UniProtKB/Swiss-Prot annotation:
Its main location: plastid. Residues 16-36 are annotated as: Disordered. This is Small ribosomal subunit protein uS4c. Pfam families: Ribosomal_S4, S4. GO terms for biological process: ribosomal small subunit biogenesis; translation.
């Protein structure tokens, strides 16, 4: 299955808030609840929804998610926690969390168009796994800095997670350490994703 390109609000209505997918929010109204099936949710449906939340938030394909679950399963720590750490340390997600892009698809586009440097080298792979002490900057040209400047100016510095720091004057971000579970920007039960 390829990456989702369809209407984003449909996914948000179904799964809840997905800040990585879009900034849009559905209108609050009682008619939203009536459209969907009511009654008892089955275990399969709950697990599927949690998996879909993860997929759409991080912009992953089914195959990519399975690969991350497989890598996390080999780790000695909790599989769900390792899975979230792997996803949060992706370059496109770190750009989104630093405030250099409004959404994860926007961050993917910045990386694909070669506007981003990691430790002084151009990286054009959005799934690049960042490590602690990696320095993420924009290219030293006006166009690259202009793209990131608007997003940094509009981002809230209070929402910046503890494992990242940003220098807004030089358009530079630093990965301090691997993320803790409590700083993940998505309400999700990762154990249900692993069980699925």
């Amino acid at each position: 299955m390829s990456r989702y390109r369809g209407p984003r609000l449909k996914k948000i209505r179904r799964l809840g808030a997905l800040p990585g997918l879009t900034r849009k929010t559905p209108k609050s109204g009682s008619n939203l609840k009536k459209k969907f099936h009511s009654g008892k949710k089955e275990q399969y449906r709950i697990r599927l929804q949690e998996k879909q939340k993860l997929r759409f938030h991080y912009g992953l394909t089914e195959r990519q998610l399975l690969r991350y679950v497989h890598i996390a399963g080999k780790a000695k720590r909790s599989t769900g926690q390792v899975l979230l750490q792997l996803l949060e340390m992706r370059l496109d997600n770190i750009l989104f969390r630093l405030g250099m892009a409004s959404t994860i698809p926007g961050a993917r586009q910045l990386v694909n168009h070669r506007h981003i440097l990691v430790n002084g080298r151009i990286v054009n792979i959005p799934s690049f796994r960042c490590k602690p002490r990696d320095i993420i900057t924009t290219k030293d040209n006006q166009r690259s800095k202009g793209l990131v400047q608007n997003f940094i100016a509009s981002s809230d510095p209070g929402k910046l997670p503890k494992h990242l720091t940003i220098d807004t004057l030089e358009y530079k971000g630093l990965v301090n350490k691997i993320l803790d579970r409590k700083w993940v920007g998505l309400k999700i039960n990762e154990l249900l994703v692993v069980e699925y």
